[in-house]
């Protein structure tokens, strides 16, 4: 059940990222801004932003199962998203590993240059770890509830 929710929401988020990329291309064409040199970067940033949304989806599914509520996990998400913005002022190290800042990290919102290899590996490891941990916690919580 949990994996199907994550998969379906991830598909919706992938479509959303593709729409944003399409709007970028259309706006660049309309405004006659050269974009061909940066298209691969924007495609990669869309993919890494999508990976980061899977992290948030997994955390939110865990919170929804754990709290048995709809509104409270959304409130927690809003608070943690604001906290993610606050990590910008605390330091780059915390910003790069805070779960609710991962979309900004993946979309390269802070620096419009491609990932270095070490940044890319850190991004994949951090997001993979969050997805694994919160998926495992969600499955465990669901099993505990029904067993």
What does each model-found stretch correspond to?
Residues 3-67, 107-113, 117-120:
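Secretory targeting signals
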Residues 18, 23-24, 32, 36, ...:
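Flexible domain-boundary/linker segments
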Residues 23, 27-35, 67, 71, ...:
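Membrane-interfacial segments
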Residues 55-86:
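Functionally important transmembrane alpha-helices
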Residues 74-147:
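Terminal transmembrane helical anchor/hairpin motif
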